[in-house]
């Protein structure tokens, strides 16, 4: 999922659909899995394993229930059990219980698990987000303008592969009589287009890329297809199969796939599709699998029950509560059957938490509650220990490797899910060579680089093999190739504006693509962008745009700069030219302007006031680096831009050629606690010949380039004010984080303008403006909500600006 607001909406829809579908078979017998015959064989193997242990002592099964964030309490329970030296012979778990149980089964100590869950950035782990630095400049700007984005429609080859899988697992008679493109009749064609379109829509808030890659970093040595009895401690987990509404009991397979499926909360994570199954969170069928432990013949069953019962009216307040209630509803029958099975039941007191309580404070408290709940059962556990006798949990195999702390050597690198040509292209981008030791950071850098191409739904990795050197396999899942996006904003300058975007082939790695963007409302514009991306060399681009700007349409304030103009622009340029950290683009531009003469009111500077209608030919080049970690509220990084344009010809009227140089820089210079100091500097100089009026310097407002591309922001002036040929603005923002997503910013800036640099410093010819403001910001899912009060020496008046939504 590539957009947060879109994800929240689809999350709710997916939850409702999942609950509705599974509720229809809510009373299906929960203990019978999707493959009873295979499950029976696996069960016999486990029974034989326990029988052998029983020759020496009673056998012990540890069952960990699901519960989302509440599952962190399992670590505290395991820590206490280890302190009593109670041996565990098999671990069973569902959802988060499956995750924690798998770590224990892989040989991780409670102390290591404690450290791991505290080190996870859960806000990132539960999404597919990658650091902003891996995303292309164009994609970054798209995401910072578009509120809802819907990728749609698979490529012909991807859809053909999908149909083959559907036919393989569902049966050809349930699909098409003949799989082909360019259908023989209109009904076939319509059906294929419809199914392709609907099938390409997102199935969850996230595909689970980040959480899957967490598993991959912790399970090295156990990532091949295997019997889970061969883990250091035998392990079983449960998922829910949506087609049959039966539990999928994982006794063997790929451990990462099992873990990803057992905690695939509908709507939060996309379902796991494997071997003809559509798998979601196991809690919807068997959230507390003590019945499986009983069937395998464990003599002693210790259960950790995180169920909080049904919530009442006052307790259903947020997404986490709704998800918890839905899971409890669907798994209620199996839970009621299983709850009395354990010999000892440990119930941490976690009523104030829900499935999504992953903040640092909650995680620490939940973990401690697990310790306390286990300690509360000390008498019962001591009694069990006397029955079991001496001994402790023994690992049957080597521990898994955590590549967070222990780099591993790899023998080869393969990228699956792409063509040979694309594989070579991506191999060059990631730059990982075989026969070297690599760390988690190196692998995640490669994964993020590939995912940052915006060509895949998700990118995951595996380290196959039981010992070094391992095979690094990067798995790429192609997604839809087209997209539709919409953004919206209300502010006090333009009232309501809507941004629409439609892209064809924009999620392809290579080849031609087309993108169309239109702004509807005050000062509308439309832009068509065609580009051709190759495996090597720069991207070739052609843009054509129309823009109408009328600053006098709404009388909401005063401005010295009255502007009404019509603009048509064509550009032919090269992009994706890399120069160290800079993205470079260069090309040829034709700019047609038809200006209203009112624009000349109160304009200072050495400009050509006669060229109000003309087409201007120019060549230009831009260098830009952007390392901010967030486009709106960064806490680290910088932006640096350098631009040059040479306007050399007027197609309708003769002009004297002139130049324009621009420079901008912004950084988060210092952060102390909740305070961030953000200095910035921007400058533009138009010189040589007789610069035409459309190229004059402009400053004001909160959005750069709102009325003219060269407009610079200035705290203290709304709308826009025309300035002389040289304009420089120095600014510092002091941003204080009040609490989560809420900020208060003090802004101070100074602008200086002069007609010629040789006159700079001359009191009579240099014009300076001081501006200051105080801004409150809320970082909402629909974009920043901001209100600022400001003042400038330009008019010696105070002003106000309100914005709700993304800037565009």
Give the location of each predicted region:
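Bacterial Sec-dependent N-terminal signal peptides
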Residues: 1-36
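Patatin-like phospholipase
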Residues: 24-94, 102-448, 452-464, 470, ...
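Acidic/histidine-enriched alpha-helical segments
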Residues: 311, 382-399, 519, 637-640, ...
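Gram-negative/organellar outer-membrane beta-barrel architecture
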Residues: 441, 460-463, 468-621, 625-628, ...
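C-terminal outer-membrane beta-barrel translocator/porin domains of Gram-negative envelope proteins
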Residues: 483-488, 619-739
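Short loop/turn motifs that connect adjacent beta-strands in outer-membrane beta-barrel proteins
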Residues: 507-513, 535-541, 577-582, 629-638, ...
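Short glycine-rich beta-strand segments
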Residues: 547-551, 591-593, 641-649, 684-686, ...
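C-terminal hydrophobic structural anchor segments
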Residues: 735-768
């Amino acid at each position: 999922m590539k957009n947060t607001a879109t994800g929240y909406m689809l999350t709710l829809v997916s939850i409702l659909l999942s609950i509705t579908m599974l509720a229809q078979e809510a009373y299906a017998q929960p203990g019978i899995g999707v493959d009873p015959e295979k499950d029976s064989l696996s069960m016999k193997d486990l029974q034989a394993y326990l029988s052998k242990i029983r020759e020496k002592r009673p056998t012990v099964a540890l069952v960990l229930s699901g519960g989302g964030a509440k599952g962190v309490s399992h670590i505290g329970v395991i820590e206490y059990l280890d302190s009593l030296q109670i041996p565990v012979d098999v671990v069973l778990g569902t959802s988060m219980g499956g995750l924690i149980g798998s770590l224990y089964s892989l040989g991780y100590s409670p102390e290591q698990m404690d450290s791991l869950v505290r080190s996870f950035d859960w806000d990132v782990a539960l999404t597919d987000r990658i650091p902003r630095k891996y995303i292309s400049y164009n994609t970054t700007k798209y995401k910072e303008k578009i509120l809802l984005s819907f990728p749609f429609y698979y490529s012909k080859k991807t859809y053909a592969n999908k149909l083959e899988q559907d036919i393989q697992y569902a049966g050809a008679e349930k699909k098409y009589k003949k799989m082909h493109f360019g259908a023989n009749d209109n009904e076939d064609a319509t059906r294929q287009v419809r199914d392709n379109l609907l099938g390409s829509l997102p199935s969850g808030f996230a595909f689970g890329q980040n959480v899957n890659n967490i598993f991959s970093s912790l399970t090295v040595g156990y990532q091949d297809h295997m019997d889970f009895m061969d883990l250091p401690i035998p392990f079983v987990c449960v998922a829910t199969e949506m087609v049959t509404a039966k539990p999928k009991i994982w006794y063997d397979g790929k451990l990462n796939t099992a873990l990803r499926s057992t905690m695939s909360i509908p709507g939060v994570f996309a379902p796991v599709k494997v071997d003809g199954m559509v798998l979601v969170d196991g809690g919807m069928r068997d959230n507390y699998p003590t019945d499986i432990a009983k069937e395998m013949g464990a003599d002693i069953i210790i259960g950790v029950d995180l169920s909080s019962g049904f919530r009442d009216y006052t307790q259903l307040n947020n997404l986490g509560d709704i998800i918890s209630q839905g899971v409890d509803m669907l798994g209620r029958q199996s839970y009621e059957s299983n709850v009395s099975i354990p010999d000892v039941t440990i119930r941490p007191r976690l009523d104030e938490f829900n499935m999504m309580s992953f903040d640092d404070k909650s995680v620490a408290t939940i973990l401690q509650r697990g310790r306390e709940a286990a300690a509360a059962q000390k008498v019962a556990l001591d009694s069990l220990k006397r029955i079991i006798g001496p001994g402790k949990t023994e690992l049957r195999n080597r521990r898994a490797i955590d590549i967070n702390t222990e780099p591993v050597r790899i023998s080869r690198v393969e990228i699956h899910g792409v063509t040979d040509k694309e594989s070579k292209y991506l191999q060059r981008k990631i730059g990982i060579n075989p026969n070297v030791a690599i760390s988690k950071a190196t692998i995640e850098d490669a994964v993020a680089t590939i995912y940052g191409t915006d060509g895949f739904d998700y990118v995951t990795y595996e380290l196959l093999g039981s010992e070094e050197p391992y095979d690094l396999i990067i798995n790429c899942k192609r997604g839809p190739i087209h997209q539709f996006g919409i953004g919206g904003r209300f502010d006090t300058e333009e009232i309501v504006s809507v941004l629409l975007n439609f892209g064809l082939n924009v999620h392809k790695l290579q080849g031609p693509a087309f993108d169309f963007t239109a702004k509807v409302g005050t000062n509308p514009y439309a832009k068509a962008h065609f580009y051709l991306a190759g495996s090597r060399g720069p991207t070739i681009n052609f843009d054509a745009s129309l823009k109408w700007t009328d600053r006098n349409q709404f009388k909401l304030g005063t401005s010295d700069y009255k502007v009404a103009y019509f603009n048509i622009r064509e550009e032919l340029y090269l992009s994706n030219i890399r120069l160290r950290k800079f993205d470079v683009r260069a090309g040829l531009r034709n700019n047609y302007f038809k200006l209203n003469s009112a624009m000349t009111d109160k304009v200072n500077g050495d400009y050509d006031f006669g060229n109000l209608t003309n087409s201007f030919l120019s060549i230009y080049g831009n260098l830009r680096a952007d390392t901010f970690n967030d486009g709106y509220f960064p806490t680290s990084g910088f932006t640096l831009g350098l631009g040059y344009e040479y306007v050399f010809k007027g197609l309708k009227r003769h002009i004297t050629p002139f130049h324009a140089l621009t420079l901008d820089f912004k950084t988060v210079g210092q952060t102390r606690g909740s305070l961030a100091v953000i200095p910035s500097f921007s400058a533009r100089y138009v010189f040589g010949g007789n610069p035409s009026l459309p190229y004059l310097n402009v400053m004001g407002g909160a959005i750069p380039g709102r009325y003219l591309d060269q407009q610079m922001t200035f705290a203290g002036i709304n709308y826009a004010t025309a300035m002389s040929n040289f304009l420089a603005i120095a600014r510092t923002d002091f941003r204080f984080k009040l609490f989560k997503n809420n900020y208060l910013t003090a802004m101070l800036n100074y602008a200086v303008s002069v007609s010629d640099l040789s006159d700079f410093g001359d009191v009579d010819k240099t014009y300076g403006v001081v501006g200051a403001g105080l801004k409150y910001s809320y970082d909402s899912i629909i974009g920043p909500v901001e209100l600022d009060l400001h003042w400038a020496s330009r008019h010696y008046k105070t002003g106000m600006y309100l914005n709700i939504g993304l800037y565009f």
